[in-house]
């Protein structure tokens, strides 16, 4: 087995507004078991596909995909802050390979990432710098968005590159499943917030970041009382999506439009594209077997919360 995968939902609300203790314990056991499997695999390289939430990427320049040559986690919502351990030579070679394959991958030598990257590194690996990691941003919240097909091809291109490294490679996908938290939309905000989305939102002062956290907490409290205050979770679609990735039927999603996905499951459900990229990268290493599937809708976290592992069959 030269390639392993784990995909996991993230939520900024952990520790800020939590479900009952039995649910917390259940999720904690899922994460603990996944972390133990990853430790047993002992990856030599990690490729992490994750979104951003207007913390590192803004409308001044909004690429569909970006690979970090260097990356720093900002520590939003109490997540880990600090420097990711990016092997620059491997990242540069990966970018060249992916571009040569026909995927227009941007690069950043000053990438900033938020909880979407930090949580899986913390929960599944034990820290930001425990393993060499290639951080791959996938734009999942700022229209215009990449399609499922392009994300699948991105993952395949990265997987074909890592296949040639002769290393044990771990692919991580972060985000989803169905959810629509109160993320600002450029077409619907006032001039001040539009300016934030266009770039002035970098390095927010602590009081403004705290206010953002509190807005999300209040939205979650209201959502628990009435799921019509935001787009409702869609467990049926979430389970369908888990079936797709579990059975390596990724191309079935190619014709699902961005607008239809938003209508079905919420505008932030596009974060599942990070999972599609990760599974596509794994598939480039050979046929895979998925294991340890978990799903629970958790209104307190405004998320259909999912987790799944997979490994190549050779």
From Swiss-Prot:
Keyword hit for Oxidoreductase = yes
Locate the active site: 115, 179
Residue stretches in coiled coil: none
What is this enzyme's EC?
A: 1.13.11.16
- Entry-linked SUPFAM superfamilies: LigB-like
**UniProt-listed GO biological process terms:** 3-phenylpropionate catabolic process
* UniProt xrefs under InterPro entries: DHPP/DHXA_dioxygenase, Xdiol_dOase_suB
Pathway this chain belongs to: Aromatic compound metabolism; 3-phenylpropanoate degradation
**Per its record, what are the GO molecular function terms?**
3-carboxyethylcatechol 2,3-dioxygenase activity; ferrous iron binding
Enzymatic reactions: 3-(2,3-dihydroxyphenyl)propanoate + O2 = (2Z,4E)-2-hydroxy-6-oxonona-2,4-dienedioate + H(+); (2E)-3-(2,3-dihydroxyphenyl)prop-2-enoate + O2 = (2Z,4E,7E)-2-hydroxy-6-oxonona-2,4,7-trienedioate + H(+)
Extract the Gene3D superfamilies matched here.
LigB-like
For this UniProt record, give its keywords in alphabetical order, as a comma-separated list: Aromatic hydrocarbons catabolism, Dioxygenase, Iron, Oxidoreductase, Plasmid
Instruction: Give one Pfam family.
Output: LigB
Which co-factors does it depend on?
A: Fe(2+)
Task: Note whether Lyase occurs among the keywords.
Answer: no
| Role noted for this protein | Catalyzes the non-heme iron(II)-dependent oxidative cleavage of 2,3-dihydroxyphenylpropionic acid and 2,3-dihydroxicinnamic acid into 2-hydroxy-6-ketononadienedioate and 2-hydroxy-6-ketononatrienedioate, respectively.
The record's subunit annotation is: Homotetramer.
The UniProt similarity line reads: Belongs to the LigB/MhpB extradiol dioxygenase family.
- Which protein is depicted? 2,3-dihydroxyphenylpropionate/2,3-dihydroxicinnamic acid 1,2-dioxygenase 2
Species name: Pseudomonas putida (Arthrobacter siderocapsulatus)
């Amino acid at each position: 087995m030269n390639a392993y995968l784990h995909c996991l939902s993230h939520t900024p609300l952990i520790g800020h507004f939590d479900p009952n203790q039995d649910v917390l314990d259940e999720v904690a056991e899922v994460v603990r078991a996944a972390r133990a499997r990853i430790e047993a695999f002992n990856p030599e390289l990690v490729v992490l596909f994750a979104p951003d939430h207007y913390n590192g990427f803004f409308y001044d320049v909004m690429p569909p995909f970006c690979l970090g040559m260097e990356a720093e986690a900002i520590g939003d919502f109490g997540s880990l802050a600090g420097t990711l351990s990016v092997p620059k030579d491997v990242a540069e070679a990966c970018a060249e390979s992916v571009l040569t394959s026909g995927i227009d991958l941007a690069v950043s030598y000053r990438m900033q990432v938020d909880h979407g990257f930090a949580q899986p590194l913390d929960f599944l690996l034990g820290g930001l710098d425990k393993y060499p990691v290639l951080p791959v941003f996938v734009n999942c919240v700022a229209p215009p968005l990449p399609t499922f097909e392009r994300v699948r091809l991105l993952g395949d291109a990265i997987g074909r590159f890592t296949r040639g490294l002769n290393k044990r490679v771990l692919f991580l996908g972060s985000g989803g499943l169905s959810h629509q938290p109160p993320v600002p939309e450029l077409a619907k905000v006032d001039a001040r917030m539009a300016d934030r989305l266009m770039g002035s939102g970098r390095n927010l002062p602590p009081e403004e970041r705290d206010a953002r956290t509190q807005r999300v907490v209040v939205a979650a409290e209201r959502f628990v009382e009435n799921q019509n205050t935001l787009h409702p979770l869609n467990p049926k679609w979430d389970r369908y999506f888990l079936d797709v990735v579990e059975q390596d039927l990724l191309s079935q999603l190619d014709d699902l439009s961005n607008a239809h996905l938003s209508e079905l499951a919420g505008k932030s459900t596009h974060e599942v594209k990070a999972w599609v990229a990760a599974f596509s990268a794994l598939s480039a290493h050979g046929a895979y077997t998925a294991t340890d599937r978990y799903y629970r809708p958790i209104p307190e976290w405004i998320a259909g919360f999912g987790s799944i592992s997979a490994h190549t069959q050779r």
